[in-house]
Swiss-Prot record:
GO molecular function terms listed in the Swiss-Prot or TrEMBL record: RNA binding; structural constituent of ribosome
Segments of this protein annotated with the region Disordered: 116-137
GO biological process, one term: translation
GO CC term, one of those recorded: chloroplast
Similarity field: Belongs to the universal ribosomal protein uS9 family.
Pfam families cross-referenced by the UniProt entry: Ribosomal_S9
Keyword field contains Chloroplast: yes
Localization: Plastid, Chloroplast
InterPro entries listed in its UniProt record: Ribosomal_Su5_D2-typ_SF (IPR020568), Ribosomal_uS9 (IPR000754), Ribosomal_uS9_bac/plastid (IPR023035), Ribosomal_uS9_CS (IPR020574), Ribsml_uS5_D2-typ_fold_subgr (IPR014721)
Gene assigned in the entry: rps9
Descriptive protein name: Small ribosomal subunit protein uS9c
Superkingdom to which the source organism belongs: Eukaryota
Annotated keywords: Chloroplast, Plastid, Ribonucleoprotein, Ribosomal protein
Biased composition range(s): Basic residues: 118-137
Length: 137
């Protein structure tokens, strides 16, 4: 009886959040493709070089730019929040690959969750802090 060796592909995952956005990121050894919600990353992020640079930043710091494919399930928020959530998810996935990556990513600030979220509107005000115009008389 012959035994077959089944080759498994390693999949590393990480979750990132920013504002109202949540990105579930999976890194698969590959050629550096970015796929977001089944759409190529360039078209999903509207060919914006800034959003693409932010999404690839953790891989670029470690010099692993064309070694992993990034598959993302992103929901909520806008493109800026989703791009930053992808960056955090990629950084966390890279830490699960090799714990030695943590110090380089931490020094760049890629492992820090940005705590800023939209402040709620208060009653009696027009927005969160904007008050109606004051009239002395």
């Amino acid at each position: 009886m012959s035994t077959e060796l089944i080759k498994t592909r390693a999949i590393y995952s990480g979750t990132g959040r920013r504002k109202c956005s949540v990105a579930q990121v999976r890194l698969v050894p590959g050629s550096g493709n970015l796929v977001i919600n089944g759409i190529p990353g360039e078209s999903y992020l509207q060919f914006s070089p800034n959003y693409l640079r932010v999404s690839y930043a953790p891989l670029q710091v470690l010099g692993l730019l064309n070694q992993y494919d990034i598959h993302v399930n992103a929901r909520g928020g806008g493109l800026t929040g989703q791009a930053d959530a992808i960056r955090l998810g990629v950084a966390r996935a890279l830490c699960s690959i090799n714990p030695e990556n943590r110090s380089a990513l931490k020094s760049e600030g890629y492992l820090t969750r940005d705590p800023k979220v939209k402040e709620r509107k208060k009653y009696g005000l027009k927005k969160a802090r904007k008050a109606p115009q004051f009239s002395k008389r």
